[in-house]
């Protein structure tokens, strides 16, 4: 049915997996296709940390992270890393210890592919599947990892309330990490940045030139269709 509809359309906008995008490009009609998202969110040392953390939580917990535009990784500059971590924890996110991180690694990605059993599940359920005990009201599972290579399970699109968190020594390092994550599986999709827009104009310019994505967002949740002020004011 999908193939028949494509043949009748004047132009096709296809979002989904590789099969859907390939079908659109093979339809004989003009097509724009975007596959998987692997959205990195950079938190600069000039960012409003409360706004950044609450925006990411609102976005990542919407539909339990099923939206392909939702944040998959958070890259935090070293200067504010401890503050950001403290804020995530205070807002109900759970930081996995090294042993727990390894257990979740083996659950989120199996044989190189996303485990369908975690998609759209609550954080506590994913922890249970992994053999990890967390509070029932946990919002997001966060794994502190170093590698942005595709061999790192946390570097993949996860479509669930599971986040990778990276420490960047400076803004250039953060850009390098974000570029690599997008290359892992997010070309043409979404990238997000939290920064002081007045003092950080040069950084924003560099960011927009280096991120090979269609959606480049600044100081806003990446998956929510409507932004509300409680993202900043949530207590």
Predicted regions and their residues:
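Short, well-ordered beta-strand elements within core beta-sheets of diverse protein domains
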Residues: 73-76, 159-169, 190-195
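Short, structured coil segments at secondary-structure junctions
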Residues: 8, 27-28, 211-212
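Short glycine/threonine-rich loop-to-helix capping motif typified by GTGT followed
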Residues: 199-210
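ALDH superfamily catalytic-core signature
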Residues: 21-149
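A common structural junction motif
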Residues: 91-96, 182-186, 215
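A structured beta-alpha segment of the ubiquitous adenosine-cofactor-binding alpha/beta core
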Residues: 1-9
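Beta-strand->loop->alpha-helix junctions that form or flank phosphate-binding loops
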Residues: 96-102, 193-194, 216-224
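Conserved small/polar residues in nucleotide/adenosyl-binding loops
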Residues: 227-234
């Amino acid at each position: 049915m999908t193939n028949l509809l494509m043949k009748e359309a004047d132009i096709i906008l296809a979002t989904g997996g590789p099969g859907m995008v390939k079908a659109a490009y093979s339809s004989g009609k003009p097509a724009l296709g975007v596959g998987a998202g692997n959205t990195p969110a950079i938190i600069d040392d000039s960012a409003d940390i409360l706004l950044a953390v609450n925006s990411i939580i609102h976005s990542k917990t919407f539909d339990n992270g099923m939206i392909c535009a939702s944040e998959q990784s958070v890259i935090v500059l070293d200067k504010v890393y401890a503050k950001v971590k403290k804020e995530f924890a205070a807002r109900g996110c759970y930081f996995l210890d090294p042993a727990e991180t390894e257990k979740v690694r083996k659950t989120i990605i199996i044989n190189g592919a996303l485990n369908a059993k975690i998609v759209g599940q609550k954080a506590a359920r994913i922890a249970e599947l992994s053999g990890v005990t967390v509070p029932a009201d946990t919002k997001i599972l966060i794994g502190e990892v170093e590698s942005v290579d595709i061999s790192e399970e946390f570097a993949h699109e996860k479509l669930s309330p599971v986040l990778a968190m990276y420490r960047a020594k400076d803004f250039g390092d953060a850009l390098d990490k974000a570029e690599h994550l997008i290359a892992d599986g997010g070309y043409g999709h979404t990238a997000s940045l939290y920064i002081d827009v007045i003092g950080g104009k040069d950084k924003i310019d560099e960011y927009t030139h280096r991120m090979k994505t269609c959606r480049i967002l600044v100081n806003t949740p990446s998956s929510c269709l409507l932004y509300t002020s409680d993202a900043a004011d949530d207590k």
